[in-house]
């Protein structure tokens, strides 16, 4: 629903990078390459990278059904 | 067992460092690693009193997310079991961030400001009061100060000859840190005894020693630790505190078995 605060595997904090990652790779008019964005954000390990790459925000989808 | 040991920084940063330690046994290296993960305490939210939660998430889910937010910890001023109260109050439409946590003690606050806790829509509201407690990673993973702490042997590369002209040109991948022993064959500037992280030559020994046949071996009793923290304290603090807990336990054992 919301982005996980930490990487499930190693415990590194990944939540703080989510909004920038989302803005640059999915919402920008010219989306950047996620690989490059993750490198620039300093998310190095592939366990942490998959946390951001595979995430989808669901709050907007769930909220009408409260 | 008394043996001389030596500590050297390969890379040094606030949150990430690589440290070379010589003259310790593999068992002791693992002891330090385990102490860094399990025995250095950090503050983490443990109890949450929900005053109002009309968000799309359950109280328990909010509690879990708050528990995972790293909090700055000064280990000189607190003891295991100490509590600090934090509060969070956000009205929708907006997002509650870790920076919205208001602490009763300025020394304990969120280490990262941009962690989204929950997205609130129009008319939704989150108000909680939370107690952060100082405890060790042994008790719960949220109290771990060290993240992805590990070590490798320091490695040395020996040039054993030239590659044949028609030999297979396969990559020769190596990770970790090498101690330069064959500077005369290395590409670029190199001096013997220098510590080189393998990512400097893209982890491929062909780039470092072009056209040479090489053999890699471990340097005995030398370990390169990779230490990363979640922001609760610096890497230096983490390593020193870990070694201190080991020393305390060794002293305790020595006193206990003395006649």
From Swiss-Prot, chain A:
Gene Ontology terms for molecular function: DNA binding; DNA-directed RNA polymerase activity; zinc ion binding
Principal cellular location given in the protein's record: cytoplasm
Domain of life: Archaea
Subcellular location: Cytoplasm
Keywords per UniProt: Cytoplasm, DNA-directed RNA polymerase, Metal-binding, Nucleotidyltransferase, Transcription, Transferase, Zinc
Record-linked PROSITE patterns: RNA_POL_N_8KD
Residues noted as binding Zn(2+) in the record, renumbered to the chain: 7, 10, 47-48
Protein name (database record): DNA-directed RNA polymerase subunit Rpo10
Organism: Haloarcula marismortui (strain ATCC 43049 / DSM 3752 / JCM 8966 / VKM B-1809)
Curated annotation (Swiss-Prot), chain B:
Disulphide linkage map: none
Entry keywords, A to Z: Cytoplasm, DNA-directed RNA polymerase, Nucleotidyltransferase, Transcription, Transferase
Compartments where found: Cytoplasm
A single GO BP: DNA-templated transcription
Superkingdom: Archaea
Leading EC class: transferase
Full protein name: DNA-directed RNA polymerase subunit Rpo3
The organism's taxonomic lineage, starting at the top: Archaea, Methanobacteriati, Methanobacteriota, Stenosarchaea group, Halobacteria
């Amino acid at each position: 629903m919301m982005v996980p605060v930490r990487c499930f595997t190693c415990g590194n904090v990944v939540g703080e990078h989510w909004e920038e990652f989302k803005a640059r790779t999915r919402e920008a008019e010219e989306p950047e390459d996620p690989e490059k964005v993750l490198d620039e954000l300093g998310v190095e390990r592939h366990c942490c990278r998959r946390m951001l790459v595979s995430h989808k925000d669901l709050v907007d989808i769930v909220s009408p059904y409260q | 067992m008394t043996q001389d040991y030596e500590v050297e920084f390969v890379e040094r940063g606030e949150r990430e460092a690589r440290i070379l330690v010589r003259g310790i046994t593999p068992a002791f290296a693992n002891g330090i690693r385990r102490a860094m993960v399990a025995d250095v305490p950090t503050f983490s939210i443990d109890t949450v009193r929900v005053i109002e939660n009309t968000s799309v998430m359950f109280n328990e889910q909010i509690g879990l997310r708050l528990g995972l937010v790293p909090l700055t910890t000064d280990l000189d001023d607190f003891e295991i079991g100490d509590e600090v109260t934090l509060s969070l109050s956000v009205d929708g439409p907006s997002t509650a961030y870790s920076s919205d946590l208001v602490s009763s003690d300025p020394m304990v606050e969120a280490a990262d400001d941009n962690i989204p806790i929950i997205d609130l829509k129009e008319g939704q509201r989150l108000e909680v009061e939370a107690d952060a407690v100082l405890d060790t990673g042994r008790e719960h993973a949220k109290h771990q100060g060290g993240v992805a702490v590990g070590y490798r042997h320091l490695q040395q590369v020996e040039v054993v000859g030239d590659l044949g002209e028609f030999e297979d040109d396969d990559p020769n991948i190596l990770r970790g840190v090498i101690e330069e022993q064959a500077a005369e064959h290395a590409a670029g500037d190199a001096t013997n005894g220098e510590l080189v992280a393998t990512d400097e030559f893209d982890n491929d020994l062909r780039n470092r020693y072009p056209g040479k046949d090489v053999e890699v071996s471990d340097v005995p009793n030398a370990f390169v630790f990779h230490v990363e923290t979640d922001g609760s304290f610096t890497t230096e603090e983490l390593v020193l505190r870990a070694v201190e807990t080991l020393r305390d336990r060794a002293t305790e054992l020595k006193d206990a078995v003395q006649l």
